[in-house]
Design a protein with these regions (language model features):
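Interface-prone segments of viral and bacterial extracellular assemblies
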Residues: 1-347
Length: 347
């Protein structure tokens, strides 16, 4: 998170009562910690205490009467004020979006003039990278599934948080497994939101910063997220590197690969199910050092109807936060038998 001058919108006359803000709480990703504290310091801390983590929050300005908000955190002994946070650029999705949508229409857009190329924005649990915004058509262009996240489907109405540079980070260190409660107390020129009126956001720490990035640009038989396959399962992917991806242009999930983070392994799990979703067989493979894997149809169980593929990275016992997971059908299950003989009789 870079140092920026706080943005305060023009205050218009109206109700100056502090209102509850729509907000998002998150365990701070590695890239944000690097920008906040420097990579050497962060890496040293994680080397000594790999399970430590930090928490943050971003909030949407309720109206122009609101100046900023205070982040309050409860680690079990009651709420303490931890830091201030500036309200972030925000919007809502006008329509549902799928895995592939990199341009989509927004509504309820506020303060998008603050966003710059490569700024991180978040929709639900997916981090995207800002590319551009057409203010006339309200169309946002992004890169999908950045850093330790993967592309997800999002429903219309989902909130878009442009929290890069506009969030509050608690500088206390927490450990994996700790359960925290966070609140954003908004401030106007004459009022502060009561603690009891602010929405509680619960968060469980999971060692996010130390975990390797997942594989990206995963294809099954040369397709992204296919609904079915008809023959051998051919999986391809590219690698990501948490330590390397700390500057320059942000890589989206569909971009090319980089050298994998040192000491990181790539594991593949293929599970076969019959028509009743009963597990028939599970095959696991260490595919480190490669970028493709073929599972022959002849090696599949005769009654296989659906297949689940999980592709993940592991380093020093820590799995990636968001592995690639996809389930699809084996269409040959529905094929007509090829070895039937017929007898024709005259009537």
């Amino acid at each position: 998170m870079q140092s920026v001058v706080e943005y305060v919108p023009p205050i218009t006359s109206g109700d100056s009562t502090a209102k509850n803000a729509t907000a998002i709480a998150f365990e701070v990703p590695y890239i944000e910690l690097v920008e906040q504290y420097g990579q050497d310091e962060v890496d040293t801390k994680l080397l000594n205490y790999p399970e430590l983590g930090y928490v943050g929050m971003a909030a949407i300005r309720p109206n122009n009467q609101h100046v900023n908000a205070s982040l309050y955190v409860d680690a079990g002994a009651g709420y303490d004020e931890r830091t201030n946070l500036d309200f972030c650029p925000s919007a809502s999705l006008k329509n549902d979006i799928g895995y592939f949508d990199s341009s989509f229409e927004l509504e309820n857009v506020t303060e998008f003039e603050l966003l710059e190329v490569n700024h991180r924005i978040q929709v639900n649990d997916e981090i995207m990278a800002f590319v551009s915004f057409d203010a006339v058509k309200n169309v946002l262009n992004v890169k999908r599934g950045c850093f330790d996240t993967v592309p997800q489907k999002h429903d219309a109405g989902s909130k878009v948080f442009g929290w890069d540079n506009y969030s509050g980070i608690d500088d206390l260190e927490y450990l994996s497994g700790e359960v925290l409660s966070l609140k954003a107390l908004t401030l106007t020129g004459s009022d502060i939101l009561e603690l009891s009126e602010a929405t509680t956001h619960s968060l469980t720490l999971s060692s996010r910063a130390i975990r390797p990035y997942p594989p990206a640009n995963v294809k099954i038989n040369e397709e992204y997220f296919p609904q079915e396959i008809e023959t051998d399962l051919i999986l391809t992917w590219v690698d990501r590197n948490r330590l390397q991806q700390t500057g320059g242009e942000i890589l989206g999930w569909f971009d090319g690969g980089v050298a994998i983070e040192p000491n990181t392994q790539t594991h593949l799990i293929i599970t076969q199910f019959n028509e009743n979703q009963i597990e028939l067989a599970t095959n696991s493979a260490n595919v480190t050092g490669t970028s493709s894997y073929t599972f022959s149809i002849s090696a599949m169980q005769p009654d296989t109807r659906t297949i689940e593929v999980i592709l993940k990275t592991v380093r020093d016992g820590y799995e990636c936060l968001n592995p690639f997971v996809h389930i699809f059908e084996l269409s040959t299950f529905f094929s007509a038998p090829y070895n039937i003989t017929y007898e024709v009789k005259e009537l």
